[in-house]
Amino acid sequence: MDVRQSIHSAHAKTLDTQGLRNEFLVEKVFVADEYTMVYSHIDRIIVGGIMPVTKTVSVGGEVGKQLGVSYFLERRELGVINIGGAGTITVDGQCYEIGHREALYVGKGAKEVVFASIDTATPAKFYYNCAPAHTTYPTKKVTPDEVSPVTLGDNLTSNRRTINKYFVPDVLETCQLSMGLTELAPGNLWNTMPCHTHERRMEVYFYFNMDDDACVFHMMGQPQETRHIVMHNEQAVISPSWSIHSGVGTKAYTFIWGMVGENQVFDDMDHVAVKDLR
């Protein structure tokens, strides 16, 4: 488990390129036949990937000491979106087949969660966010047909994109975790511009569906103290409440966003005008 401490905005603005990457970038999300796990002190979110290839993968009691519990989801809820080939997630004996861009919400208290790929030639890639939970909501599969899609932006401003809301109150109940998938239209490069912050929530972006020769310049920092982190395919970045989170790519891309914090009101944002950015 990679533990990331929270950081004050006054400290963050003094960091150089490597310092920013050390604090906020999750460089390696998927490792064959393993799970990765980054624990952030910011709202206690856990972020990672699970890629079963030749065997099943589960998060066992080895994380209990670090989380102060007997098993992983004793006091947590889990959201998983599969960006790879078809796979299965077995929750306390109940097997769910999770295809490409399908998702599974797992409620607090699930003791055994096992991940597997159906075809080792095209393994599943389960990207997950995990957050503290105060009650148990039912485990539920979510398909692309069930999400709440919203198309925003314009080709003229190069930010035409479709936001697919997987884990939001309109789709299912969670304690605090919200997740979704945003896909840029061909030829569009900007996400979340004009940008915003949200004082009451933190957020993690996971960029994928990128060519090897492409990258995203992820913008972060306070609106008057902006910085950037160069992102490559299948990497994630942590965004504190005080930071903007926006990006521009050298080619179109897709990203998964996950939020935890005070509320689940999607539009609870503090908008920042482009003219006010520095």
Swiss-Prot record:
Residues the entry annotates as binding Zn(2+): 196, 198, 203, 245
Top EC class, one word: isomerase
Catalyses which reaction(s): 5-dehydro-4-deoxy-D-glucuronate = 3-deoxy-D-glycero-2,5-hexodiulosonate
Keyword terms, alphabetized: Isomerase, Metal-binding, Zinc
GO biological process annotation, one example: pectin catabolic process
GO molecular function: 4-deoxy-L-threo-5-hexosulose-uronate ketol-isomerase activity; zinc ion binding
Cofactor binding: number and manner: Binds 1 zinc ion per subunit.
Needed cofactors: Zn(2+)
NCBIfam families the UniProt entry points to: PRK00924.1
Family under the similarity heading: Belongs to the KduI family.
Protein name: 4-deoxy-L-threo-5-hexosulose-uronate ketol-isomerase
Source organism (scientific name): Escherichia coli (strain SMS-3-5 / SECEC)
Gene that this polypeptide is encoded by: kduI
